[in-house]
Amino acid sequence: MAEITASLVKELRERTGAGMMECKKALVEANGDIELAIDNMRKSGQAKAAKKAGRVAAEGVILARIGAGFGVLVEMNCETDFVAKDAGFLGLANEVADFALANKGTTIETLAAQFEEKRAALVAKIGENMNIRRVQYLDGQVIAQYLHGAKIGVLVAGEGSDEELKKVAMHVAASRPEFVNPEDVSAEVVEHERQIQIDIAINSGKPKEIAEKMVEGRMKKFTGEVSLTGQAFVMDPSQSVGDYLKSVNTKVTNFIRLEVGEGIEKVEEDFAAEVAKITGGNA
């Protein structure tokens, strides 16, 4: 039996909106597998569509560079927001981004080796760990970029207006699409969601045959919600991104989105515990 920690229960609550006891029970039944717990809770009606896992806890910056026919995003992490704004840290991060631009296709391993000496020296000077975490390239006829406070970086590749593609990049930053078009959603993802929706319908009392017919309509909505062109455009929710792109004669071929610290869980202590540690328990 996997250990059901308080942080795991907290994450499940944040992602489903369900109560603490329901979340703990679901995790116990799923042996600590949070994704399985979410699926089971959705099937039983305890949770609606769960929020995507995207715990942003680590600090740092996302930097973007655009070259001839390609763009690159680089993520560099540190431990605190204070250091993320430090001139030395930002200087090194910009050096890394410039190197990635000048050496298209470079790997994260190459970047780490190239800048290890400077990184180690900066760690010794500042007294805080830091690392180059990710580098991602995107090829395209036209590349647009959008950075949201150096915490979220988006590159959009396409054909047509750079200005319009930048608006789409802003949409990607806000709405987190996973695919470009509804038809790009993989069969595996569609089937996984279909089975969940069928179980939800059956658990609500619908016969299996009727449940399966009901779900087909829901699947079209689902693929639209997770794809860029199927989503409502944040700058004009009355139309989809796809319809907007057609109206401005612009096409999106691909995109990438990085957010600082995605998937990294930062250990947090409550205020009382922190005070106790500082005072040696003599608060």
From Swiss-Prot:
<protein>
    <recommendedName>
        <fullName>Elongation factor Ts</fullName>
    </recommendedName>
</protein>
<dbReference type="InterPro" id="IPR009060">
    <property type="entry name" value="UBA-like_sf"/>
</dbReference>
<dbReference type="InterPro" id="IPR001816">
    <property type="entry name" value="Transl_elong_EFTs/EF1B"/>
</dbReference>
<feature type="region of interest" description="Involved in Mg(2+) ion dislocation from EF-Tu">
    <location>
        <begin position="80"/>
        <end position="83"/>
    </location>
</feature>
<keyword id="KW-0251">Elongation factor</keyword>
<dbReference type="GO" id="GO:0005737">
    <property type="term" value="C:cytoplasm"/>
</dbReference>
<keyword id="KW-0963">Cytoplasm</keyword>
<dbReference type="InterPro" id="IPR018101">
    <property type="entry name" value="Transl_elong_Ts_CS"/>
</dbReference>
<comment type="similarity">
    <text>Belongs to the EF-Ts family.</text>
</comment>
<dbReference type="Pfam" id="PF00889">
    <property type="entry name" value="EF_TS"/>
</dbReference>
<keyword id="KW-0648">Protein biosynthesis</keyword>
<dbReference type="GO" id="GO:0003746">
    <property type="term" value="F:translation elongation factor activity"/>
</dbReference>
<comment type="function">
    <text>Associates with the EF-Tu.GDP complex and induces the exchange of GDP to GTP. It remains bound to the aminoacyl-tRNA.EF-Tu.GTP complex up to the GTP hydrolysis stage on the ribosome.</text>
</comment>
<dbReference type="InterPro" id="IPR014039">
    <property type="entry name" value="Transl_elong_EFTs/EF1B_dimer"/>
</dbReference>
<dbReference type="InterPro" id="IPR036402">
    <property type="entry name" value="EF-Ts_dimer_sf"/>
</dbReference>
